Amino acid sequence: MSYQPQTEAATSRFLNVEEAGKTLRIHFNDCGQGDETVVLLHGSGPGATGWANFSRNIDPLVKAGYRVILLDCPGWGKSDSIVNSGSRSDLNARILKSVVDQLDIAKIHLLGNSMGGHSSVAFTLNWPERVGKLVLMGGGTGGMSLFTPMPTEGIKRLNQLYRQPTIENLKLMMDIFVFDTSDLTDALFEARLNNMLSRRDHLENFVKSLEANPKQFPDFGPRLAEIKAQTLIVWGRNDRFVPMDAGLRLLSGIAGSELHIFRDCGHWAQWEHADAFNQLVLNFLARA
């Protein structure tokens, strides 16, 4: 039987999660079947979703025999919104813990991009026994950069887009989000803008969260040595959102880690270099 590509609609699922005395309706996509599960965690950009973030990576993982879970973190996609005054990454980790508990999944491989990488580290620090392998892309620890003034130009444009969600500001952000902008089609811009504007509560609550706590993503640097999971760190050489030296901090702090840097690549390695990225990840997951 020939392989049938996964679709967002057919794999869409919801679960209720208790958080700080409230019930949140959390959306995720559940793709494929397999003894091992890979959870994909998206970044913090306006309009981001698990499916949109990893659209070029889902089928290769499923075809390789993995069950793939794509979570919409609270405040993104079809999940409920929230004003968060603590660590956003620890919040996402708690939500993920509840989801995998309800799905009766004992252990997961984690693959996170940007905020998703930071949230993957938070999950691993809190529940190390639940993590198989770790893939961190363009994120994983906060803290300052030795070479790049903070906040970076990418983060400045991201925050501006949250406050003024226009097509002009979206294009300004995406113009430095990836290295080669020729793949940024009008259809992609329109889909991302529609995602943003369909959930203005997400945009407003992200801004309120920043006002309540500007440091949504704490510095995990001092705790990286606690991570024992085999870890693949992936970075774009031309990332203008999270500087490449953050990847070097992860490499230095996590004993069982290795670093792969893509040249001619911005903040979206899994999309910009999808074929090479997919093979890199599959080889890493398959190793003993």
Curated annotation (Swiss-Prot):
At the top of the EC hierarchy, this enzyme's class is: hydrolase
Keyword Transmembrane belongs to the record: no
An example GO biological process term is: 3-phenylpropionate catabolic process
Q: Where is this site: Transition state stabilizer?
A: 114
Q: Which domain of life is it from?
A: Bacteria
The UniProt entry, under InterPro entries, shows: AB_hydrolase_1 (IPR000073), AB_hydrolase_fold (IPR029058), Epox_hydrolase-like (IPR000639), MhpC_alpha/beta_hydrolase (IPR023791)
Iron-sulfur keyword on record: no
Keywords, comma-separated and alphabetical: Aromatic hydrocarbons catabolism, Hydrolase
What does the entry list under GO cellular component? cytoplasm
Pathway recorded for this protein: Aromatic compound metabolism; 3-phenylpropanoate degradation
Named from the GO MF annotations, one term is: 2-hydroxy-6-oxonona-2,4-dienedioate hydrolase activity
Q: Which reaction does it catalyse?
A: (2Z,4E)-2-hydroxy-6-oxonona-2,4-dienedioate + H2O = (2Z)-2-hydroxypenta-2,4-dienoate + succinate + H(+); (2Z,4E,7E)-2-hydroxy-6-oxonona-2,4,7-trienedioate + H2O = (2Z)-2-hydroxypenta-2,4-dienoate + fumarate + H(+)
Which chain positions carry the site (Catalytic role in ketonization of the dienol substrate (substrate destabilization))? 192
EC annotation from Swiss-Prot or TrEMBL: 3.7.1.14
Residues forming the catalytic site = 267 (proton acceptor)
Complexes and interactors: Homodimer.
Name the HAMAP family for this protein: MhpC
Tell me the function of this protein.
Catalyzes the cleavage of the C5-C6 bond of 2-hydroxy-6-oxononadienedioate and 2-hydroxy-6-oxononatrienedioate, a dienol ring fission product of the bacterial meta-cleavage pathway for degradation of phenylpropionic acid.
Please give the family membership noted in the entry: Belongs to the AB hydrolase superfamily. MhpC family.
- The name of this protein is 2-hydroxy-6-oxononadienedioate/2-hydroxy-6-oxononatrienedioate hydrolase
